[in-house]
Amino acid sequence: MNTHPTPASQLAAAVDELHRAVTADRAGAAAAVELVSGAIADALRPYTPTVVVVRDNLDDGVLAHVVSRELDLPTVRIYEDSGLLSLSPPPDPGARVALLAASWHDMSALPALRLLLAHAQAEVVAVAAALPVTDAVLAAVDGTPVVTAAASSRTPR
């Protein structure tokens, strides 16, 4: 774990690189993924999650791997098959969830994911994203804290 703050310009460049990677439908440069994921992990620490939950796709999976590694937490994947959502492995009852995505551009999924986790007796303590979130996403999370790579101790305040 890097304990030295990352300059804001370097973090912004990494987020830009990750955004280009996501829009080009590829995982992106390893250095950008490491930097952005580390910043997300730093931003999540105050919420003390016990598990990272992520949709099963390449971009989100790569971020979840690094964030989970940085926080020393397990990862739970959300699978979708014929419109049905499932968790694998299921989180422990009472789990404190960091719900992670590279981008929450499709916020229509958020209520369904939160409901799925509530049925699993897990509490979403933070919604995390690599890319900046919109006001619509903020409204969809209904008061749950939202963290991004920009809100990190790796960025000078």
Specify the residue positions occupied by each region the protein language model found:
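PRPP-associated nucleotide enzymes
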Residues: M1-R157
